[in-house]
Amino acid sequence: MQAQVMKTKCNVFYGIIKNRTPRVVIPISKINYRQIPGIFSKYSSRGFAIGVTSDISPVLLGKATDFSLFLSFGNTETVFSLRLRSTFSNLPRLPIMTF
């Protein structure tokens, strides 16, 4: 899997989380942040995450639903939940969770 950093004035971060426990909403108390820039990855019993950060964006690491694409705009995180298929065609509409 690959994730790319989008260079904007909003300091956007995005990546992909894969979870071993599907359909679990991230409690706000379970979110972990890292301030380390560059490519990151995390592996644990809860699943794994991989993505890219810009210099000052926090990194969102945690459980979501199945595969999730997440965006970080400063201190506001938005998680787009989707179920990945063998191809990216005909993806379902993405429910948005903001917390």
UniProtKB/Swiss-Prot annotation:
Recorded name of the encoding gene: YMF23
Any one annotated GO CC term: mitochondrion
Record's keyword terms, sorted: Mitochondrion
Compartments in which it is found: Mitochondrion
Official protein name in the record: Uncharacterized mitochondrial protein ymf23
Highest taxon, organism lineage: Eukaryota
